[in-house]
Amino acid sequence: MFSLRKTKLQPVSLHQCRLSSLFRGVLIHAIEVTGTQSQASLQHGLAGKAVLSNAKYLSVLTRFRTSTRFDVWSIHRREAISSISGSILLQARDPAKLNEEIQIAVDEHRCDEAWRLFEQHMQMEGFPRKSVVNNVVVCFAESLDSNWLQKGYSLVEQAYEEGKQNLLEKEPLLYLSLALAKSGMAVPASTILRKLVETEEYPHVSAWSAVLAHMSLAGSGSYLSAELVLEIGYLFHNNRVDPRKKSNAPLLAMKPNTQVLNVALAGCLLFGTTRKAEQLLDMIPKIGVKADANLLVIMAHIYERNGRREELRKLQRHIDEACNLNESQFWQFYNCLLMCHLKFGDLESASKMVLEMLRRGKVARNSLGAAILEFDTADDGRLYTKRVSGKGSEVKEHDNPETRVVSIHSMIPYDEFSRDRKFLKLEAEAKDVLGALLAKLHVQVELITSERGVLQPTEEIYVKLAKAFLESGKMKELAKFLLKAEHEDSPVSSDNSMLINVINACISLGMLDQAHDLLDEMRMAGVRTGSSVYSSLLKAYCNTNQTREVTSLLRDAQKAGIQLDSSCYEALIQSQVIQNDTHGALNVFKEMKEAKILRGGNQKFEKLLKGCEGNAEAGLMSKLLREIREVQSLDAGVHDWNNVIHFFSKKGLMQDAEKALKRMRSLGHSPNAQTFHSMVTGYAAIGSKYTEVTELWGEMKSIAAATSSMKFDQELLDAVLYTFVRGGFFSRANEVVEMMEKKNMFVDKYKYRMLFLKYHKTAYKGKAPKVQSESQLKKREAGLVFKKWLGLS
């Protein structure tokens, strides 16, 4: 027997397509295949009660057909009935029973069956019961399968589109958002969070911090994470939410905390969106979040990347006073400070920092306290190397990183998720992801290391300082610094010192005058060197036919008591012969015989050079050659002017910023992406300056076409696009979108869709005016193109 429900019918006016799809759903999805009864038996009524029940059901449909209001049914009746052939019986599915079947499929984790039944219910009566809808969402989320996650998200999307978001509960939506984030689907994950905030179903900060943490592991996800924190943080600017009202408790539970900011900022750092990260830093005092040790170090990285040296100096006081920073965090801060000194060409401050580190290291090595410390830590060294938290807590033996990674990339059961009302497990998960992000930041520290708890410079800082001194032509200062460094550091042989390596690098790169100047500084400082460096420089002079310099170098070698090898004399003889100076060549040969110098002399430099050019290990000489060959870094003056323009733009003093930009150009400094980003965000903050941004856009394109100093990045183009959309300059907005898509940059369509609906909701609706100018026509076309790109047409 079939269980048939009485259906209340009311005569309404329906569109033909709507009506036909409705009744076809009732018929075709209410089919039961018996497989035992023939067509003949069906025609002669031998199917029994089932056929009678179906006949009764069809009689109801026949009455629909005879009604004048449902005249359209006759068009599709023949199609529906004729499609039923063979051993097929009609059955009207009971929605209540269908709900039960969906629930059973969900309980048994049969996602395909649950989805098939869900689609049947959607075509019959729309969405199932609220509990069933949420259970389907949870089932798809638990699978962590991209196909089912997409179907789950499409289900949620359809519910919001049809205004039935009341069917969706907050916890299943959060669970789905977490699953999407873990599967690398950052856009739908962030959209669900945004929808929850819009509908005032505020997610707890511990829950959405875990979603953000997984989103931040990818480039587009990290950018979206920063946008989400800015959007949610805006709700709490300047204490606008009263904590005394009980009704504000759910909203206050969503307020961004230190961990959320650390996650978003670390993601921005790893994927290079540091100007977006600086916007997050500007928000911190407005929402009253306290900085911890991790946040202080992350701030240092951001200030270094953006060239904010003064901010770094202010931060240094907090770093030095903080009592909960571990060794790694000190490395990272002073590495950032050292890098910033190099960016600004402040070689004096950088060299002073290096010498101070060496001096402290020498004291530590020679002190009795260091010896005691080394003895005490000999048995406890394993724990010392595992210090990971700010207060020096150790990682326990059972904290296996592999098990932690598994927990990060698998879903906790929904039962546990729903019971954890404070979302402590998700908070711990976000903390684990943050630890992984911070570990990647630590790997980027290359200028500083540590010995017995004392910061020490690496070879990389010597290489970078040597390059900076050479580029600025400060040979005397370079020699003075390197000699002091060798005095403070552990002694090395004169032929293997840093200064000799720099001289050899200069020779191999053809910087012979600089090499000669450094040799002179060594000689005047009383530092004795071997013959190999003189031999190398002499041969280089001979190869370039610099006779005067050869004579000068020979005189210097004699003063220093250096005996040249046979290869030098051979090079001198060959040079004289090339210049047709036979008499000079004979004199050199006689001098060589009188000195009793054997052939096959020192070939040390040639071997060293071949080793660097081949696949030898990246030693000090190789690093020097690679660093010096690289293109010169950004002019320090650009950093200075960028800071000035950023200051004025941040304060809203755009006239002063314009004057600074004009002065910057007049001094020969070419503006870069950071310069224009400060200007555009400054104009956007004060509003109604869209013409000025349009002029800047034209200048950016012309500079980018003419020079390589101007490179469009995601942050700059996103700021320009936001301003154009806000002002309704859709022709320019389409240009920016085209450029971003051509460069495969992520565009946050959701943000621009909301922005468009906020300021231009009624624009470009209905038919175009009959009378309009060409410019109006183009503006309308551009607006419609942008609207179509947003998916609003």
Swiss-Prot record:
Major subcellular site: mitochondrion
Protein keywords: Mitochondrion, Repeat, Transit peptide
Annotated compartments: Mitochondrion
InterPro entries given in the database record: Pentatricopeptide_rpt, TPR-like_helical_dom_sf
Membrane-spanning ranges: none
Pfam families: PPR, PPR_2, PPR_3, TPR_At1g68980
Domain of life of the native organism: Eukaryota
PROSITE patterns recorded: PPR
Transit peptide, residues from-to: 1-87
Cellular component annotations (GO), alphabetically ordered: mitochondrion
Swiss-Prot/TrEMBL PPR repeat ranges: 257-291, 292-322, 330-364, 458-492, 495-529, 530-564, 565-599, 601-631, 637-671, 672-707, 713-747
UniProt cross-references to NCBIfam families, sorted A to Z: PPR
The family this protein is said to belong to: Belongs to the PPR family. P subfamily.
Protein name as it appears in the record: Pentatricopeptide repeat-containing protein At1g03100, mitochondrial
